[in-house]
Amino acid sequence: MVGPFCSASVCIDLKGMKNGDRTGFAAYNGDSGVLTVEKNKGKKELVMSEQYSVFGDNQGVKVIKEVKTKEMARIPLKSNRIYLRIDGEFGLGKDWATFFYSLDGKQWNRIGEPVKMVFDYRRMFMGSKYAVFNYATKKLGGYVDVESFEYK
């Protein structure tokens, strides 16, 4: 993610998801803002959450003790294709990521609240980044197709 302003979007085909699968798009810099499509009991939902690390000390070394999740929004999803977008604003005193979704790639809906992208070189990462992900929580075999990634 590059300032003072940037925007990235992905189009994901969800037809191959199995129950328990998770896929999505995130902005992270130690703490994260995450758009996740979850499939459970044959139904898909889009979840917007903030994930943040709780640090501790292990013999003088800073370590992550746990990662906490704050869910900000959850909506049912009937489509087998979704567009996810994250806008970054890195002006003086801003450092925000704002999250959007679309079912057609044209009309965008904001979801959740902006997430502060905390820049702290002593923690995890130098600079905010985008991430596209897909994983199983129950059984292997599901998949998604990332049809596009656009960055401005």
Name every feature range the model reports, one short phrase each:
Residues 1-152:
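Extracellular glycan-recognition regions
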